[in-house]
Amino acid sequence: MAKVKICGLKDPDMVAFAAREGADWVGFVFAPSVRQVTLAAAETLLLSVGKATPVALMVDPSDAEAQAVAALGFPILQLHGQETPARAAELKSLTGCAIWKAIGVQTRDNLGQIGTFPDIDGLLLDAKPPEGATIAGGHGAAFDWSILKGWTAPKPWLLAGGLTPENVAEAIAATGAPGVDVSSGVERIRGLKDRELVRAFIRAAKASEQP
Ligand SMILES: O=C(O)c1ccccc1NCC(=O)[C@H](O)[C@H](O)COP(=O)(O)O
């Protein structure tokens, strides 16, 4: 059974709903995005996570920004920018958070950099942002899952990018992903999660067979 992260939540009721439906992680975006939350909003959202684990998503944060987010009590920091292995290690020791690094995948070569991040705790394999995009993630674009054929993950990992309730079972079967992450695929209006889609995604992922 694959684990599920619902990313880009902004509304406490939706956070509670996703957690009740069985989301393992709920993600909050602290970067420019239609899904961005403030520190004050995140403090309120954290009250609704139930049994789900909250993940703070940041893009090239400064020390002060990362420390302010970590101080809210997030156990996991997902880095979605151009953070180097050294910066990821630095942010880990600075915040005390587990670090997940997002890796943009377009070709098999992109997987090579993963070995240069020995200090991180997890990986999120996501599609690269479309040409000209100024936002680092949440574009609803998938990469070619066959790139992962024969790849052995050195860390716990999640598959992301363009997943939907309709394709998540196929994605898990094709890649063997132990976890999946979704943002746009559970929205009907950009930036607003939809209960029916959140429920359908979690059910489809949890019911799926890993190869
Ligand atoms: O979701 C955002 O708005 C976002 C903004 C800036 C950096 C990262 C962002 N999201 C990162 C995620 O973990 C998304 O869930 C991931 O990119 C997959 O998104 P989608 O293809 O929309 O499901």
From Swiss-Prot:
CDD domains listed in its UniProt record: PRAI
Amino-acid biosynthesis in keyword set: yes
GO biological process: L-tryptophan biosynthetic process
Classification via InterPro entries: Aldolase_TIM (IPR013785), PRAI_dom (IPR001240), RibuloseP-bd_barrel (IPR011060), TrpF_fam (IPR044643)
EC number(s) on file: 5.3.1.24
Recorded catalytic activity of this chain's protein: N-(5-phospho-beta-D-ribosyl)anthranilate = 1-(2-carboxyphenylamino)-1-deoxy-D-ribulose 5-phosphate
Sorted UniProt keywords: Amino-acid biosynthesis, Aromatic amino acid biosynthesis, Isomerase, Tryptophan biosynthesis
Coiled-coil zones: none
EC main group: isomerase
Organism domain of life: Bacteria
Pathway named in the protein's UniProt entry: Amino-acid biosynthesis; L-tryptophan biosynthesis; L-tryptophan from chorismate: step 3/5
GO terms assigned for molecular function: phosphoribosylanthranilate isomerase activity
Family, as annotated: Belongs to the TrpF family.
UniProt xrefs under PANTHER family: N-(5'-PHOSPHORIBOSYL)ANTHRANILATE ISOMERASE
Protein's name according to its UniProt entry: N-(5'-phosphoribosyl)anthranilate isomerase
Protein source organism: Hyphomonas neptunium (strain ATCC 15444)
